[in-house]
Design a protein with these regions (language model features):
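Short alpha-helical Gxxx[C/S/T] motif in the catalytic ATP-binding
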Residues: 187, 191
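Short alpha-helical segment of the dimerization/phosphotransfer core of two-component systems
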Residues: 48-53
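Short helix-loop "hinge" at the ATP-lid/N-box region of the Bergerat-fold HATPase_c
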Residues: 130-131
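Helix-loop junction within the histidine kinase core
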Residues: 64-75
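Primarily the dimerization/phosphotransfer
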Residues: 1-31
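Short conserved segment of the HATPase_c
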Residues: 162-174
Length: 226
């Protein structure tokens, strides 16, 4: 019962992010004289967050989704450079920190086979987590192709960092760095389940000491049965 309560508490907190985005970007659409490019971008963000919200609600309904075998995935081909830009723009507009949130890549586009909603859920989890521990400075989402041909995503912040002794357990269920920070400590655990199902890996960069850096790799093609 305690685990279910913690799960529901965490999901309630995560649901606030897409809800705030929907409210904020819907308001932008009502701005007089809004240009077409901004209108299209707002519509894209609203659609992405509507899909994310639906997935989160489904997770709340099915608490057993903490078991990767029960998580539902829809694998299709998606362009992820634009996805990253939209996620960063969304969070930059609703952030509760003075830290800058930015996206860095040398890629103009990159298509991968993934579940777009689940990938967005991972990116949002990692970026929102960074805002909790980074009151000033910067939070950077980066995307590149690594030496093995995987898409490598990283979220780097200039916050308080993660003690070395906690880095091996931080992806466990209900693990929290700071008990005073809202949430049940399931966000990173869910990220690990998602990326494992998508054929990748996630880890903490222990060599980065100016804050925290989370890195995950994602294959360009899926080998799993759809």
């Amino acid at each position: 019962i305690r685990n279910k309560s913690l799960f529901l508490s965490n999901m309630s907190h995560e649901i606030k992010t897409p809800l705030n985005a929907l409210a904020g970007f819907s308001e932008v659409l009502t701005t007089p004289g809004i240009d077409e490019a901004t209108r299209v971008q707002c519509n894209d963000v609203i659609q992405l967050n509507s899909e994310l919200l639906l997935k989160l609600i489904n997770d709340v309904v099915d608490i057993s989704c903490l078991d990767v075998a029960n998580m539902k995935f829809s694998i299709t081909t998606h362009e992820v450079v634009a996805l990253c830009r939209n996620v960063v723009k969304m969070l930059d507009n609703i952030k509760q920190t003075s830290a800058d949130i930015r996206f860095e890549t040398e890629l103009t586009s990159l298509e991968i086979e993934t579940d777009q909603g689940r990938l967005q859920q991972m990116l949002v989890n990692l970026l929102v987590n960074a805002t909790k521990f980074t009151k000033e400075g910067s939070i950077t989402l980066a995307l590149r192709l690594d030496e093995q041909g995987f898409a490598e995503f990283s979220v780097t912040d200039t916050g308080c960092g993660i003690p070395l002794e906690r880095q091996s357990t931080i992806f466990g269920r209900f693990e929290k760095l700071n008990e005073g920070v809202q949430g049940a400590g399931l966000g990173l655990s869910i990220c690990k389940l998602i990326i494992k199902r998508l054929g990748g890996e996630i880890w903490v960069d222990s060599g980065y000491t100016a804050g925290a850096r989370f890195v995950f790799i994602h294959p360009l093609k899926q080998e799993v049965v759809r």
